[in-house]
Amino acid sequence: MSILERGLGVGELLTSMSQRDQLVALARTLHREGYNDHATGHITIRQPNNTFLVNPFELTWDELRSSDILEMDDQGNQLSGKYSITPAITLHIELHKARHDLHVALHGHPQWATAWASALRIPPIYDQTSALAGNNVVLYNAYGGSVDAVEQARSAVLAMGTSHTALLAHHGVFVAAESVSLAYMWASTIEWRARRAWQVEALGGTKSIDDKVVESLHEFVISNISQFPTFEAAIRAELRHDPNMFA
């Protein structure tokens, strides 16, 4: 019986998947959410032995399969895989060194959020869905080139503080999370928020949602992420398009 036929409850699909499958699922679903700037973008997932799974440099997120996933050590040295690791993995390495509580990191150039990052603005929160990720977003405005430089990567991680989402000025988005479910929530929501904010401001703008309401919604997400069906629903949609993506 296939995953699509099981009628699993919320959380059961993810539990049945390997970490490699989860990385593929995160890449595939976020590609459809707008993280689709060709072969750019990278995802790392910390494993129990403190090595990391990472997507290959050569493949786009929408063609990724579980057998394509690479493994690296905590210094970025490749341990397995037939493809190569992105030269820009330094940002991930420094994040994982500094924050052992964060098991997933991702970087991409989604269309709408990157537009706001290039305008040096954090998009306001005008709707409930945008509020789910809270106000926990920073703008890192010291970007001066590639984040493969160690000192620049460390500076970006320091600037993030306890935030889970950073807009890298003139560059893109960096997300860090405790789990793949939260990584999907933060990454998909910042792109949704960026698009909605642009649309609202194109209509003339309005008052943003009160900070207390935003924080309340954000805390609800953190406390109940295991009961949110959104990520697994997105995974099932990808499996309908490509039943072999976990091969």
Predicted feature residues:
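Glycine-rich flexible loops
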Residues: 1-247
